[in-house]
Swiss-Prot record:
GO terms for cellular component: actin cytoskeleton; adherens junction; catenin complex; cytoplasm; plasma membrane. It is a peripheral membrane protein. This is Catenin alpha. The keyword Membrane applies. One of its GO terms (molecular function) is beta-catenin binding. Residues 878-890 have a biased composition (Basic and acidic residues). Residues 878-905 are annotated as: Disordered. Associates with the cytoplasmic domain of a variety of cadherins. The association of catenins to cadherins produces a complex which is linked to the actin filament network, and which seems to be of primary importance for cadherins cell-adhesion properties. Disruption phenotype: Mutants die at a late embryonic stage with severe defects in head morphogenesis. In embryos, RNAi-mediated knockdown in the hemocytes has no effect on their developmental migration during stages 10-14 of embryogenesis. Keywords: Cell adhesion, Cell junction, Cell membrane, Cytoplasm, Cytoskeleton, Membrane, Phosphoprotein. The gene is alpha-Cat. Disulfide bonds: none annotated. Belongs to the vinculin/alpha-catenin family.
Length: 917
């Protein structure tokens, strides 16, 4: 037995000494807590038992029953403790001592409790029982903690075996000895990982659980690399890099083992978690948003102004760094600068309003408007910063394997100069991944997601030099089989780690931002690709086409991963269909056209390149990505969409990238307002309308939305499979929604001609609906249903005609003294009203078509129904709700957590009369 020190007791488990303090009753595992919980409940209930009422005399039956329950529970603890003591000779003496203490305190508790149950009104007896209960719980807790240390002992025993195996691996001098030691290490490490997994599930402290999980993953992941690196070192001991390579992996494995040891003994390997915490810039914006709202009475011109201005300048400095980064597009940089200036101005306006309201208790309308404007401007700045971050992600995570593969190819050739060049490129690539990952973290409030990204980035940072070392070893020993195996192992480890980092980054990047940015990037690349074709640059064409292929593939992968968060439904079906079309049809055609074009340019035979066909294929890629984005956004309400994430800022292909055929020329190049600077399309003009006119349009849109709710309840419930009436109705509804979006300066319709073409599509769909519905009416006997159905068809024809007339909406824009005056309220409201009326007519037509089809069908006259009326299966809720970035802190509030009370602390709250004196 080892001697106890002043702080605690050293318990000798065979050759393993565990230090523990008998006075420290901290419960670290859930199993101890759950085992102790029933006894705590029984004891505290007994202590809280009230005496009989004044009218009645005698014993408390309830107290007597509780005493018996406590005695039985104590007896169970004694039996289990003795069993554990005799099964584990290393701890028998300590366990039996703890069991004796439980017996002693249990007997004292039993006597005190029975005396109390005989006389529940006695304060003295209640106080005696409280002290006895406290002593009993302390003894039982000590017994359980000691029993829990048996599991720790077994874990540490396995851990020491693994440590011995690592020492043998380190000192192995031959391949045979190394392989024998490695097999033994593999078995023992596997057993240690299992025991550590069990311990991880038991631990209460989330930080310790995370540390143990990371250590287990590290031990498991690095085992293969440890083998190959050790084989290289044993085979080529003359190479310094081989030792460096082996020592790095050995240290990683040893660190993992040490972490398991620390956690098993209740020590965190990291006093402060360096990876935790939300992004700095996101947190600064949140703090600023909270700071701008205050009571005007508390506003201080000197203190408040200085504080808010300093906070804002700090945010703008960080935004400027992001704007000046390499991958930030010029257009994005200009937008960030513009938003920073707008936020500055909004803050000055807000501070002026606070100055004017300092003597008022309630906010004036001007102050409320200034606060709203301030919030809007910070939200706009956030959005541009998020887009800038996604710009970097889209570029840096586009091709993550090429730098490594180039490095490996250079290493295989044995060309040291080339390897040095490729190593520099690979290092810059790794540094860029880490830099972008940290940039993504800076704009995220998702603390768990940020922690994962930071940890994955740290792994990339530490692994990069060792990948280069493995390549350098292969360079000087290109024919060595063990060097080749080692390089393959490091390549696989790198690819896995990059995939983990990519997925972690995607998790804290909203898919809406990702798709909006990817769409713009693909548009840029399509322009470059066509330009390369037109100037005959085969190399640039191949490189740019590769970027398009990579971006498109990544869009497909990210969207498929996002759809995994949903249960299968009509929404996911449509999105995945759009992905399938892009991947299997559009990209296949594009790849063929690129191959043909590159081949023709390489052979200097420009005449063989069908430029128009190539441009068509390129345009289809852009349209395919755009269609995926449109499908993803279909389940968003207008409130969920911010204006910059919708379709409005995306411009179509520029003139030089369009086909020269007549099919691709037309209104797309037309400036609808050639005399007005800053406005090109009718949709842009709609955004410039006065706030008063916008409010009136919003009122009309609200009426349209109410009609849309009726449409959803009456039409959307039907399955459109085998029912063209429902299909046409939904198609018309979608176009009408795009039209109403246009009146607010949103949506995919940009020009007046777009709206006119949309009206034509509605009219065509209305004609088809009329024809189909009349066939149903003809089969229906004369009745009020038939008459009403035909009447509603006449309404559809009328309102389709009205929409065609009102679709020629074009806001009148005048420039008076440098100020744009936009007037188009009447035409916009007319279009919305016509759409609302048409939707109402469509709803009624569907209702009466159903009645006519099912209620009045004559027997024997129709071989099969014209349409099939089948209820659509209810759409399932997403397994994980898409998280909007502004919701993380702005709308989601953390509920008060239930505090888990330590049993000893619970009992210490009871105070006996004797203690109080």
């Amino acid at each position: 037995m080892l001697k106890p020190d002043k702080m605690g007791t050293l318990t000798d488990f065979g050759q393993i000494a565990l230090k523990w303090d008998p006075k420290n009753l901290e419960i670290r595992t859930m199993s101890v807590e759950k085992t102790l919980e029933p006894l705590v409940l029984q004891v505290t209930t007994l202590v809280n038992t009230k005496g009989p009422s004044k009218k009645k005399k005698g014993k408390s039956k309830r107290a007597s029953a509780l005493v018996a329950a406590v005695e039985k529970a104590t007896e169970n603890f004694i039996q289990k403790g003795e069993q554990i003591a005799y099964e584990n000779p290393d701890i028998t003496q300590e366990m039996l001592t703890a069991v004796d203490e439980v017996k002693k305190t249990g007997d004292a508790m039993s006597i005190a409790a029975r005396e109390f149950s005989e006389d529940p009104c006695s304060s003295l007896k209640r106080g005696n029982m409280v002290r006895a209960a406290r002593n009993l719980l302390s003894a039982v807790t000590r017994l359980l903690i000691l029993a829990d240390m048996v599991d720790v002992h077994l874990l540490l025993k396995s851990l020491h075996i693994v440590e011995d195996d690592l020492n043998k691996l380190k000192n192995a001098s031959s391949q045979d000895e190394l392989m024998d030691n490695m097999r033994q290490f593999g078995r023992n490490a596997g057993e240690l990982i299992k025991q550590a997994a069990k311990r991880q599930q038991e631990l209460k402290d989330p930080q310790l659980r995370d540390d143990l999980a990371a250590a287990r993953a590290m031990l498991k992941k690095h085992s293969t690399m440890l083998l190959t690196a050790s084989k290289v070192y044993v085979r080529h001991p003359e190479l310094d890099l081989a030792k460096v390579n082996r020592d790095f992996i050995l240290k990683q494995v040893c660190d993992a083992v040490n972490t398991i040891s620390d956690v098993a003994q209740g020590k965190s390997s990291q006093p402060t978690d360096i990876y935790s915490g939300a992004g700095e810039l996101a947190a600064a914006l949140d703090d600023f948003d909270e700071g701008i709202v205050m009571d005007p009475m508390t506003y201080s011109e000197k203190r408040s102004r200085q504080l808010l201005e300093e906070r804002l300048e700090s945010i703008i400095s960080a935004a400027a760094l992001m704007a000046d980064a390499d991958c930030t597009r010029d257009e994005r940089r200009e937008r960030i600068v513009a938003e920073c200036n707008a936020v500055r101005q909004a803050l000055q306006d807000l501070l002026s309003e606070y100055m004017s309201n300092m003597s008022q208790k309630d906010n004036s309308p001007g102050l409320s408007r200034a606060i709203d404007q301030m919030c809007r401007k910070t939200r706009d700045l956030r959005r541009q910063l998020r887009k800038a971050v996604v710009d970097h992600v889209s570029d840096s995570f586009l091709e993550t394997t090429t730098p490594l593969l180039d490095l490996i190819e250079a290493a295989k050739s044995g060309n040291e100069k080339k390897v040095r060049e490729k190593s520099e490129i690979f290092t810059k690539h790794a540094e860029k991944l880490v830099e972008v990952a940290n940039l993504v973290c800076s704009m995220s409030n998702n603390e768990d997601g940020v922690k994962m990204v930071r940890y994955a980035a740290a792994q990339i940072e530490s692994l990069c030099p060792q990948v280069i070392n493995a390549a350098s070893i292969l360079t000087v020993r290109p024919n060595s089989k063990v060097a080749q195996e080692n390089m393959t192992t490091y390549r696989q480890a790198w690819e896995v780690q990059v995939r983990i980092l990519t997925e972690a980054v995607d998790d804290i990047t909203t898919i809406d931002d990702f798709l909006a940015v990817s769409e713009n990037h693909i548009l840029e690349d399509v322009n470059k690709c066509v330009m390369a074709l037109q100037v005959g640059d085969a190399r640039d064409l191949r490189a740019t086409a590769g970027a398009i292929q990579g971006r498109s593939s990544r869009v497909c992968n990210v969207v498929e991963a996002e759809m995994d968060n949903y249960e299968p439904c009509i929404y996911t079906k449509r999105v995945l269909e759009a992905v399938k079309v892009l991947r299997d049809q559009v990209m296949m055609k594009f790849d063929q056209r690129v191959g043909a074009a590159v081949g023709a340019l390489s052979n200097n035979s420009n005449k063989d390149v069908d430029e128009n066909d190539f441009i068509d294929a390129s345009r289809l890629v852009y349209d395919g990505v755009r269609e995926i984005r449109r499908a993803v956004l279909m389940n968003r309400s207008s409130e969920d969409l911010d204006t910059d994430t919708e379709f409005e800022p995306v411009e179509d292909l520029t003139l030089e990238t369009r086909s020269r055929s007549s099919a691709h020329t037309g209104d797309q190049t037309v400036d609808e307002y050639p005399d007005i600077s800053g406005i090109c399309t009718a949709r842009e003009a709609m955004r410039k309308m006065t706030e008063e006119d916008k409010q009136k349009i919003a009122q009309q849109v609200e009426l349209f939305r109410r009609e849309k709710l009726t449409f959803d309840s009456e039409v959307a419930k039907w399955d459109d499979t085998g029912n063209d009436i429902i299909f046409l109705a939904k198609h018309m509804c979608m176009i009408m929604m795009e039209m109403t979006d246009f009146t607010r300066g949103r949506g995919p319709l940009k020009t007046t001609m777009d709206v006119i073409n949309a009206a034509k599509k509605i009219s065509e769909a209305g004609t088809k609906l009329d024809k189909l519905t009349r066939e149903i009416a003809e089969q229906c006997p004369e009745s009020s249903t038939k008459k009403d159905l035909l009447a509603y068809l006449q309404r559809i024809a009328l309102y389709c005609h009205q929409i065609q007339i009102t679709s020629k909406v074009k806001a009148d824009v005048q420039n008076i003294s440098g100020e744009l005056i936009v007037s188009g309220l009447d035409s916009a409201t007319s279009l919305i009203q016509a759409a609302k009326n048409l939707m109402n007519a469509v709803v009624l037509t569907v209702k009466y078509s159903y009645v006519a089809s099912t209620k009045y069908t004559r027997q024997g006259t129709v071989s099969s129904p014209i349409v099939v009326w089948k209820m659509k299966a209810p759409e399932k809720k997403p397994l994980v709700r898409p998280e909007k970035p502004e919701e993380v802190r702005a709308k989601v509030r953390k509920g008060s957590q239930k505090k888990v009370q330590n049993p000893i602390h619970a009992l210490s709250e009871f105070q006996s009369p004797a203690d109080a004196v």
